[in-house]
């Protein structure tokens, strides 16, 4: 069962732990946006928020950000009307949910010759959540009622979300799915993870109608005021009225759609010959320190130094953050001098990721590479790698720096 949202614990200082995290999801229906940019954008907002609600978040605490892509507007009113309608639909959804969009990215140049990008507004929703409050998408076991939380108006939808959240906080929600392309898709994808079947309780519903904002939930007990659409079963099938299909068949069909683009299976290569070699000589590192010191330079824009330090500490290293100060030229010179001395006493350098200063224009990691090309720093880094058998790692922006410094692939 695919996940509809990403969840992450908030970064904390090394040595500390937290159960507080964030959950984030997106919403976008290209077909709906092409048919009606206003309705498509409005639905995108509701879909993104419904996904984080289904994952366990409280919609009252949600914030949004948008990405928009449209054709070149030129001087044609019809073209101007598409982003205007989309943004109006997104704004109305924000007002209905009291959820503000912060920042975003837009492009009004999506035209090449006579080809235009379709009207596109992608809504991203984010909210705080505790790890223990997260709800996953896969049916857990047979015999559970499957319920629909939905309403036709904004007030009815948010009331349904509040009811769902209260049940989730009470531990009565085993799994949940934010409906996008219909109830049939929802129960199918919820069935895939644990091969738990589903039998529909009613055929009166339109099982293939998109329902932006709707949530399907597997509950551990009966709820009299909610709409029960079916029940989970031990049979590995999905039954809706007279239609029945095996979960394995549906899984194969689901995976086959993009199999030619993103293969999930490898061809049988036949018998693979095994090669072995034995030697009495074993290489050992030149570093004879049980707890090596790892130096973490923190540049303006670096954003994963805490996670990097914690990972190194858990692996047994003595990790230290080194703040690169660049407020004045004297600060930079002082940072260079102190960093070169710190490298001399270290066995590992780890450059964390982020959007370092000077990334644009012309690519990333320019500030990092300029710093490491300083003669004093270069001398100590070369000594670390070539004479003291030290290590150097780079993450994201830091890895870009390793490439541009020439350290990848040849270590020089």
Where on the chain are the PLM-derived regions?
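Glycine-/charge-enriched secondary-structure boundary and capping motifs
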Residues: 79, 83-121, 165-295, 302-339
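Glycine-rich phosphate/pyrophosphate-binding loop regions near the starts of catalytic domains
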Residues: 1-155, 202, 298-300, 346-371
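Short, well-ordered loop/turn and helix-capping segments at boundaries between secondary-structure elements
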Residues: 54, 189, 193-196, 221, ...
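Short, hydrophobic/aliphatic alpha-helical segments
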Residues: 1, 41-45, 161-173, 378-387
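A glycine- and small/hydrophobic-rich beta-loop-beta segment
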Residues: 140, 148-176
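Flexible gly/pro-rich beta->alpha loop and the following alpha-helix that scaffold active-site loops
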Residues: 311-314, 319-393, 399-410
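Buried hydrophobic packing segments
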Residues: 44-49, 164, 186-191, 368, ...
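Short glycine-aspartate micro-motif
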Residues: 23, 176, 197, 348, ...
